[in-house]
Amino acid sequence: MAAAILRFEDSRVTGPDSLRVSRLPAADKGGKWEICGICDGIEPAVFNRLKALLDAGKREEAWEGCLQYVLDNTAAARSWMGSDVHPATEFILRDHHFNSGSRNTGKILQRALNIHGAGLTVDGIVGPKTRQELQDQLGGTDEAVFLVGLQEKRKAFYRSCKQFPVFGKGWLSRSERAYQFACSLI
């Protein structure tokens, strides 16, 4: 999962040999530089450690560091699931979490659950009620059906962002690639 998320952040990266430091677009608020979505302006300590490894030629170690960072950074999404029985949903939640943060991921999740009558408050806080509803819905429906709603709410989230005119095409493309990857896990 983590490797796929890194590839969605930088499509030119396929593993340690192609791992690189890239300049962020001027409109990006994450800083000036990134390594597969790990930005100098958001996670400076992690970025600097990974960059130092790349500069020292320790590409394998840098790649492993990126993978571990993704897993650690998105662990909350995994905990919401309650088990590893639904890897496709876990993947979409982790990918969105890495790209848009915990609160925004919680909101798309709550909106997707509400499609099926959950009646949740959409506040982005994935508390006991949201977790139970997620587990109940996944236990009582086809995961592919749930993913359609989650994907719909993810795309709606991106379309609502102020920076959609600048980054929207890329966000929707990433979302579609992530959805296709998730479907392959079912």
Residue ranges of each PLM-predicted region?
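Cell-wall polysaccharide-cleaving catalytic domain and substrate-binding groove, primarily
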Residues: 1-186
